[in-house]
Amino acid sequence: MWIGIISLFPEMFKAITEYGVTGRAVRQNLLEIQYWNPRDFTFDKHKTVDDRPYGGGPGMLMMVQPLRDAIHCAKSVAGDGVKVIYLSPQGRKLDQNGVQELARNQKMIFVCGRYEGIDERLIETEIDEEWSIGDYVLTGGELPAMTLIDAVARFVPCVLGKQASAQEDSFAEGLLDCPHYTRPEQLNGLTVPPVLMSGNHEEIRKWRLKQSLQRTWLRRPELLESLALTDEQSKLLSQIKQENS
């Protein structure tokens, strides 16, 4: 997977490229990330990248010319088939379905806004999609871009040690994850559920599914409204509701 980053602060992405699963993916050439800083496309000695908005009001906007030129340069390197994404509070809210949808793209450019945002005409002419990571405001698009990179990279073949992990994580099937346990067997008087030490893989699977359903029902019941539950899931959910009534 190839990802281009348009950012005034490309150094922030060391958190993605040098550490953890994504850092390993970069070192193994499974994930390639390139950067374009709009400051490098300015012509004045101050490398100005902000400008006043028409109509007045507080704050500044990113200057059109440096940002547009940076996007064009990134597009020319990426070639055909690249999708340009602007990280914006006005965008489609990211969820696991959105992550899997984005992961099907082999080439993406993430445009990270700053100040009060970017000129609407750039959105209309240069941006393919807008995405948001939640209903709150951040100081820039870098953290949302890193969130998207981390999430989609998990679906790149061979990035995870066990590819099934991406399919078994929270939200992979629209449900919250089940509880997990490791050694020691007892911790502060609490013990590991016996079923997990039984060696019965089918019973363990059923226990995990029930726990996942229960967590979702108790903590995020709205997630269940959009799911087409299997017969097994429906029966387990009925049991859960009876046990908690």
Curated annotation (Swiss-Prot):
Catalytic EC class: transferase
- Output the superkingdom of the source species: Bacteria
Output the GO biological process annotations, alphabetical, semicolon-separated: tRNA N1-guanine methylation
The catalysed reaction is: guanosine(37) in tRNA + S-adenosyl-L-methionine = N(1)-methylguanosine(37) in tRNA + S-adenosyl-L-homocysteine + H(+)
| Compartment(s) of residence | Cytoplasm
Question: Which SUPFAM superfamilies does the entry mention?
Answer: alpha/beta knot
Q: Which UniProt keywords apply?
A: Cytoplasm, Methyltransferase, S-adenosyl-L-methionine, Transferase, tRNA processing
EC numbers on record: 2.1.1.228
Under Pfam families, the record lists: tRNA_m1G_MT (PF01746)
Molecular function (GO) terms for this protein are: tRNA (guanine(37)-N1)-methyltransferase activity
Question: Matching NCBIfam families, A to Z?
Answer: PRK00026.1 (NF000648), trmD (TIGR00088)
How this chain assembles, per its entry, is: Homodimer.
Q: Which HAMAP family match?
A: TrmD
Tell me the protein family, please: Belongs to the RNA methyltransferase TrmD family.
| Function summary | Specifically methylates guanosine-37 in various tRNAs.
The protein depicted here goes by the name: tRNA (guanine-N(1)-)-methyltransferase
Species this chain originates from: Histophilus somni (strain 2336) (Haemophilus somnus)
Q: What is the lineage of its organism?
A: Bacteria, Pseudomonadati, Pseudomonadota, Gammaproteobacteria, Pasteurellales
